[in-house]
Amino acid sequence: YLYIIFSILLVIPSIFYLYQKGTTAGFNIYFDFLLNKNIDKKISTTCFIVIFILLSVVYLRIIKEKNSFKNIKELIKYVFIVCSIFLFMLPWTSSDIFYYMGVGELDSQYGQNPYYITIEQYYSENSNKINDEIMEQAKDNFWANTTVVYGPISQIIFKLCTKISNKNINICIITFKFINILIHLLNCYLIYKITGKKIFTLIYGLNPFILIEGIVSVHNDMFVILFTLLSLYMLLKKKNIVLSVVFLGFATGIKYFSILLLPFIIIY
């Protein structure tokens, strides 16, 4: 219960922000845990560090007492509950998700190729035609003047999420977060299938850093982990090197550095 309590404490500032604003549109408070510009950032940072350390201590204690979960299903259910809490935490440590939305929106709603045109460029040339809160948010993003640096599979995911959202930024961020939660749970299961031990699923599934990066900041590394695990599963459990390479190719289609694992698969 302590892990859930400290998780809720981390989410409370976001709940207050959403209660006051009613939307994520216009969100631009980064590296300020309390999400309140009237409170000194040192106080805000101290609050986060204290809660995060306490959460990490409880996390290490749970790992030590791994037998508190009777089976893998019980463990994954617990991970899902924790992820559901972090679903409501705003991405205050990174603005990347709004960049994902922007390049997805360029593709899905405006038929533009974000590998050739930036969010900033398209918006400046067509601002009088745009009535879109996702683009309004994305144009002010730190990466708005950068073309897509991710692989094509990443872009397909961005495009599908924004297509579903129909220009609604709140639906869009929930869609991205919900998908990352599902991927995180699938990763937990794959780790168990590969290792046969709950402890490794526990170490990954409740890792505070992974939850912050994957569920709160909604980074697409969750998909890299998924396809890498599928690649390892096919190689180690199914002895199928062809499918292993295919899934590694999918991981590379998210972030290009994944190709660096190919020599190890071939050598194996």
What name fits each language-model region?
Residues 48-55, 101-102, 184, 220-231, ...:
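Hydrophobic core segments of transmembrane alpha-helices in multi-pass, intramembrane catalytic enzymes
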Residues 72-74, 191-211:
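Transmembrane-helix signature of polytopic, membrane-embedded enzymes
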Residues 189-190, 223-240:
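Specific aromatic-rich, kink-prone transmembrane helix
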Residues 71-175:
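Intramembrane catalytic core of multi-pass membrane enzymes that act on lipidic substrates
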Residues 211-214, 231-234, 241-266:
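Membrane-interface alpha helices of multi-pass inner-membrane proteins
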Residues 1-12, 18-88:
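Start-transfer (signal-anchor) and selected internal transmembrane alpha helices
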